[in-house]
């Protein structure tokens, strides 16, 4: 099997909880050794702790500054992007799709959205975890039209576009098409 990526010498030290103790580990930037999907030979990807974190099969890839470590696995055609952290025993697989935005809202936290096993969208934001619809309701209840509510509502609309949930005809009607 042709390996599709290598670990580069570029690394970051991060802290993770292992066996009840906070430990520093290194995650290494990856570089593509062959072309696949939208990745070209030589493209730099995100960071993994070991080669066990990212499969050489399929079109799975870690983009940007995303980090995959511990026993986490990314495989099949799944993509992990941006500043996402996939860790613990997490599995991102098949055609999984994940989307997040950092430093947003009243807590300046990271809001993560991903396709779940039922093909719905799960949202995590601070201590909230629920569906995209439940998140929208919570945002309306807690923030209404204040600046944080506006940020979250834009993020929800962007997520709908990202996951292909937007109303296709809305844009056409507004543009007179």
Task: Label the predicted regions.
Residues 1-63, 67-69, 177:
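Extended, small-residue-rich solenoid/repeat segments and analogous flexible loops
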Residues 18, 29-34, 73-75, 107, ...:
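Arginine residue identity/basic-tract feature
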Residues 1-6, 97-177:
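Intrinsically disordered, low-complexity terminal regions
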Residues 33-35, 51, 89, 95, ...:
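Generic structural motif
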């Amino acid at each position: 099997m042709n390996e599709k990526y290598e670990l580069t010498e570029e690394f970051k030290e991060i802290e993770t909880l292992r066996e009840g103790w906070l430990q520093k580990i290194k995650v290494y930037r990856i570089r593509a050794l062959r072309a696949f999907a939208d990745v070209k030979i030589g493209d730099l990807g995100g960071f993994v702790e070991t080669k066990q974190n990212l499969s050489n099969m399929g079109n799975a890839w870690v983009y940007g500054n995303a980090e995959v470590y511990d026993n986490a696995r990314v495989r099949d055609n799944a993509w992990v992007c941006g500043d996402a952290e996939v860790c613990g025993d997490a599995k991102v697989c098949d055609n999984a799709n994940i989307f997040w935005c950092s430093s947003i809202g009243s807590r300046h936290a990271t809001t993560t959205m991903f396709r779940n096993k039922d093909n719905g969208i799960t949202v995590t934001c601070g201590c909230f975890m629920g569906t995209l619809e439940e998140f929208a309701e919570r945002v309306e209840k807690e923030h209404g039209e204040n600046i944080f509510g506006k940020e979250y509502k834009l993020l929800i609309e962007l997520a709908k576009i990202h996951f292909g949930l937007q109303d296709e005809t809305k844009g056409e009607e507004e543009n007179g098409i």
